[in-house]
Amino acid sequence: KTDNVVYKRLAKFFGKLFIISFAMGVVTGIVQEFHFGMNWSEYSRFMGDIFGAPLALEALTAFFLESVFLGVWIFGEGRLSKKLHCLSIWLVAFGSNLSAFWILVANSFMQHPVGYTIANGRAEMTDFLALVTNPYVVGQYAHTVLSGIVTAGVIVVAVSAYRLLSGQNVETFKT
């Protein structure tokens, strides 16, 4: 949002690293979805109605939110107002956190199953709210999001230190 050229360079540089990371997440996420059907087909058959709901919500809400607004952020620079361009990356961040939430709802169910009953040889969801408010979600979500923030910070510091020590764009990376 600012007109500071150093911040703009940093945003472009680290934005490219984020795009690479996002692309890797998409690729591994798609492979993971295939694993559910191929490697864990019995689990998917037995728990699919419950386990699939949060993963479907992740794909339909969070992933599309991230993807659309990442595209807006990448291709909207210079075409959108600075406020709208800034808002687009904040919506990517929101979508990433929402994505983490839905994935962790599914994972929390695997760790501590709630809100279901066994009927006709399969697990059937009886309480979606119990699934979403599973006590394990809170701890896993806090751990995952805070770990992601710390990891991102370490990467920014490490890359900046490398660039400083190698004498590349010193004025930009000392900020």
Regions found by a protein language model. Name each.
Residues 1-175:
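Polytopic transmembrane helical bundles with strong interfacial aromatic enrichment
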